[in-house]
């Protein structure tokens, strides 16, 4: 029993250290899942994916308000903060950087990197946890 408790505590301390860092600073291949402690990585990634979608929703609402007031899309997300639509630009919870915003003539693209930290939409792959927690793809609201 003592060995089991010792192993469990070692695993707990290892996971606590792993999750104490922001996602983009973690060594993604270094996560150790064991029978002693539940799989926290999957829960953490789901939380971060929903946080990404929520932050993109805030940006989307600010873009729509800007469009209603100026009859055009903002040239960049920085224009939303300088005009008071956002207090500060939301940050992608996976990469720690800003979301990708690409306006075109009548609409725009908005997305963040997924758990694989690849923020390129060129691949056309949307993140889906069905493909594994740390699977490729961007997280796109629209």
Where are the model-predicted features located?
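Short acidic linear motifs
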Residues: 1-142
């Amino acid at each position: 029993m003592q060995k089991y408790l010792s192993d469990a505590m070692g695993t707990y301390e290892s996971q606590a250290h792993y999750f104490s860092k922001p996602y983009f600073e973690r060594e993604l291949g270094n996560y150790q899942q064991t029978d002693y402690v539940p799989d926290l990585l999957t829960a953490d990634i789901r939380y971060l994916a929903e946080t990404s979608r929520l932050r993109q929703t805030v940006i989307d609402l600010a873009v729509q308000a800007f469009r209603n007031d100026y009859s055009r899309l903002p040239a960049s997300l920085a224009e939303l903060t300088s005009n008071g639509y956002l207090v500060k630009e939301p940050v992608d919870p996976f990469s720690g950087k800003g979301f990708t915003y690409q306006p075109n003539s009548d609409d725009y693209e908005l997305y963040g990197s997924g758990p694989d930290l690849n923020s390129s939409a060129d691949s056309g792959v949307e993140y889906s946890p069905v493909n594994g927690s740390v699977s490729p793809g961007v997280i796109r609201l629209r």
